[in-house]
Amino acid sequence: MNEDSSIAELEAFLEEYPDTRFMDVFAADINGIIRGKRIPREDFSKPFEKGANFCASAALLNSRGEAAENHPHGAHDGDPDIRSVAVPGSLATVPWASVPTAQCLLELQEFDGKPFFGDPRNVL
């Protein structure tokens, strides 16, 4: 999906759900555990346009939530970010949320657009 169609997906969603205040954006780590963050409405467009920053080491935690130090993304190098972009068709409401909230699955990429080695979606 290109950037224009991603933005169109977001705009259509917000037209249907105009009171949405937050969006939970998440990606699976190397163990299949969901890691993510909640973003405010003013940041909704980031994962649908150029991409939003995402902590690279969050995708590389072990099953106990501990950081491994034998990879290029961790505390030893300042815990750098990577790029995250919305997975087309994954934007949905969170009906059980106490305030109007959306959720969206992310794909993790290097800043040059190459797939991030720690994103299980890039392995399959």
Task: Spell out what each predicted region is.
Residues M1-L124:
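ATP/Mg2+-dependent ligation/transfer catalytic cores
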